[in-house]
Amino acid sequence: MSAFDRIGVVGAGAWGTALANVAARAGRAVKLWSRDPAQVAEMAARRENARGLPGIALEAGVTPTADLREAAACEAVLLVVPAQVCRAVSGELAPLLAAGTPLVSCAKGIERGTAAFMTDVIRAAAPAARPMVLSGPSFADDVARGLPTAVTLAGEDGALAETLAAALGSSTFRLYHSSDVRGVEIGGAAKNVLAIAAGIVAGRRLGASAGAALTARGFAELQRFGRAFGAQPDTLTGLSGLGDLILTAGGPQSRNFAFGLALGQTGEVPQGGKLAEGAFTASALVAMAAGRGVEMPICAAVDAVLSGRLSVDGAIEALMARPQRAEA
């Protein structure tokens, strides 16, 4: 089996740049792709991605490129683009990839309109690739600076996931391998919506007690959803589930928390700014839950606020007015 000496990273935002540095620290030759030739030239000249991750030097093993073929020719490709453009970019990669190339989704979301998880999107758009997913509690800045981080890499072929995890791991970036692809994807998608709710609680200054209750009850929703879609319990309580929820719901370094914080402070849905995947995932997540009879009141409240059906205060009141019940 390939040792994965060459790694392609498609997407030169903050997370893509951080993962490119991760792979280079592990001794891999990395092609970091951006669609923008000017950004590529700037990264090559400055050895820094000033647009995506300023202040962090690119590792020596990272080669920026605007040629998608160079990234696609690598032995494994990390797809580090927003969830809602995963299908389009996977389609661009499809004719360039060798059959069986691992194509690893590093986005945390569900496609709007289709309610498809990212590995399903990859499977449809790039059928010759081997879909995988990388997820877990990780801020790009922490990872890029070499601070200790642990994540999960999942693929249907557990041996392949183990081999690729070993190829990307280092003394500061630990990858646990898994074959529970769906469980890892569910944790990454659901926690973003719950982090928006946590940000709203902070923005409304509802207190630490409310924040703790929100996180605990939100995790109960994540578990119910996961069970309904066949996730393994250990995955949901692991890095890609509970671990990522704790990180993302913990403060404004999280884009989704920051989005919710602004929403809670102003009562208005933020426009522009950094991408918050949870804002796009909420409606799909809630619809999927309803289709399986899964109760997710916190996520449904976030969706109602984002769609304008409820005000922030109205959503809080509705949650607190729910009938008393046993904890489960």
From Swiss-Prot:
Active site: K191
Any single GO BP term: glycerophospholipid metabolic process
Top EC class of this enzyme: oxidoreductase
InterPro entries given in the database record: 6-PGluconate_DH-like_C_sf (IPR008927), 6PGD_dom2 (IPR013328), G3P_DH_NAD-dep (IPR006168), G3P_DH_NAD-dep_C (IPR006109), G3P_DH_NAD-dep_N (IPR011128), NAD(P)-bd_dom_sf (IPR036291)
Keyword Lipid biosynthesis: yes
Any single Gene Ontology cellular-component annotation: cytosol
Subcellular location: Cytoplasm
Residues that coordinate or bind NADPH: W15, R35, K108, A140, R255, L275, E277
GO molecular function, one term: NAD binding
Pathway noted in the entry: Membrane lipid metabolism; glycerophospholipid metabolism
Known EC number: 1.1.1.94
UniProt main location, coarse: cytoplasm
Catalyzed chemical reaction(s): sn-glycerol 3-phosphate + NAD(+) = dihydroxyacetone phosphate + NADH + H(+); sn-glycerol 3-phosphate + NADP(+) = dihydroxyacetone phosphate + NADPH + H(+)
Residues the record lists as binding sn-glycerol 3-phosphate: K108, G136, S138, K191, D244, S254, R255, N256
Keywords: Cytoplasm, Lipid biosynthesis, Lipid metabolism, NAD, NADP, Nucleotide-binding, Oxidoreductase, Phospholipid biosynthesis, Phospholipid metabolism
The keyword Ribosomal protein belongs to this UniProt entry's keyword annotation: no
Role according to the record: Catalyzes the reduction of the glycolytic intermediate dihydroxyacetone phosphate (DHAP) to sn-glycerol 3-phosphate (G3P), the key precursor for phospholipid synthesis.
HAMAP family on file: NAD_Glyc3P_dehydrog
Family: Belongs to the NAD-dependent glycerol-3-phosphate dehydrogenase family.
PANTHER family, per the entry: GLYCEROL-3-PHOSPHATE DEHYDROGENASE, GLYCEROL-3-PHOSPHATE DEHYDROGENASE [NAD(+)] 2, CHLOROPLASTIC
Record's protein name: Glycerol-3-phosphate dehydrogenase [NAD(P)+]
Native source species: Azorhizobium caulinodans (strain ATCC 43989 / DSM 5975 / JCM 20966 / LMG 6465 / NBRC 14845 / NCIMB 13405 / ORS 571)
Lineage start: Bacteria, Pseudomonadati, Pseudomonadota, Alphaproteobacteria, Hyphomicrobiales
